[in-house]
Each structure stands twice: as C-alpha cells, then as structure tokens.
C-alpha cells in the first residue's frame, strides 16, 4: 500500500507500534540507520507483539542507501515535519507513496528535510504552541489518512468492498 520510512528512530516502543501498524495496514516499513536501539529490544518487540512476522520491514544503512536501493519516485516522497508548509489532509496520496518521518527528539536532519520540495513537506495540524506529536501517533494519523483517501483498499472496510 504505502511505504513508511523512519529515519534514525530512537525509541523502541514507537518502532514496535509502527511495525504493528504496518502489518495491519499492508504498508512496508523502511528503517534508516543508525537505529537508537537493537531490533531485539524487549520494549520494541512487546509494542509490536507478534506482528513482526506479518510486516515487511527493510533496513537501510543510510538515507542515501535507501534512495539508491529503492529508487522512490521523487514526486511521491513526502517528509512529515513540523516545518511542513501543507497539511497531510490537503495532500492527495496514492498507493506506493513514501511517507518519511524523522527521529523522535530532532525530526529529520536539515539536509534530508531540505532535499524535499516545500510542497512535499507536510505536517499534522496541532494546537498553537505545541512542539510535536509522538512519532508512532503521527505515523498512524498520516497512514490512515492516506489509506482513507484510497478507500481502505485491501481491508475489511465497506469502502474497500465498494471498489471491487
């Protein structure tokens, strides 16, 4: 469905939650190193429960390694950032899109963030004066909005059945 990219995630339970989300939504998860934890971390595994076997998780040595090996279409890469100009609710997502999220404590590195055209830097609306949402919550909000726009294709949702 969609490609979720976590660039240098730091907190094991957040990644575990995203693994579970990927399994339940049919997304592929890309983890860009360095990771702030071991993939065997008990907190990450607990958050992902037994969903690891149902999620497609790929690891990449760096942001450039992901770009070189996966070759995502430049026009379908979206950076989720508090520095975003547009809202995830204003973007029209397509199956196969790449949804890119930065580290919990610092977001995307400036060089990665600045490599995205301003129109592809998106944010989730928040109340004024708030810094950011939790990473796994932001991923969930974004993925479900993208999936909703595509009729929850592949799910048991009635909208998905209407498309068949």
Swiss-Prot record:
**Assigned keywords, A-Z:** Cytoplasm, Methyltransferase, S-adenosyl-L-methionine, Transferase, tRNA processing
Q: Does RNA-binding count among this protein's keywords?
A: no
An example of a Gene Ontology cellular component annotation for this protein is: cytoplasm
Q: Which GO biological process annotations does it have?
A: wobble position cytosine ribose methylation; wobble position uridine ribose methylation
Q: What class of enzyme is it?
A: transferase
Pfam families in the record, alphabetically? Answer: SpoU_methylase (PF00588)
Subcellular location, record wording? Cytoplasm
Tell me its EC number(s), please. Answer: 2.1.1.207
Q: Which residues bind S-adenosyl-L-methionine?
A: 80, 102, 124, 132
A single Gene Ontology MF term assigned here is: tRNA (5-carboxymethylaminomethyluridine(34)-2'-O)-methyltransferase activity
Under the heading CDD domains, the entry gives:
SpoU-like_TrmL
Q: Does the keyword Methyltransferase apply?
A: yes
Q: Which branch of life, at top level?
A: Bacteria
Q: Catalysed reaction per UniProt? A: cytidine(34) in tRNA + S-adenosyl-L-methionine = 2'-O-methylcytidine(34) in tRNA + S-adenosyl-L-homocysteine + H(+); 5-carboxymethylaminomethyluridine(34) in tRNA(Leu) + S-adenosyl-L-methionine = 5-carboxymethylaminomethyl-2'-O-methyluridine(34) in tRNA(Leu) + S-adenosyl-L-homocysteine + H(+)
Function of this protein?
Methylates the ribose at the nucleotide 34 wobble position in the two leucyl isoacceptors tRNA(Leu)(CmAA) and tRNA(Leu)(cmnm5UmAA). Catalyzes the methyl transfer from S-adenosyl-L-methionine to the 2'-OH of the wobble nucleotide.
What's this protein's family per the entry? Belongs to the class IV-like SAM-binding methyltransferase superfamily. RNA methyltransferase TrmH family. TrmL subfamily.
Q: How does it assemble?
A: Homodimer.
Give the protein's recorded name. tRNA (cytidine(34)-2'-O)-methyltransferase
Name the lineage: Bacteria, Pseudomonadati, Pseudomonadota, Betaproteobacteria, Burkholderiales
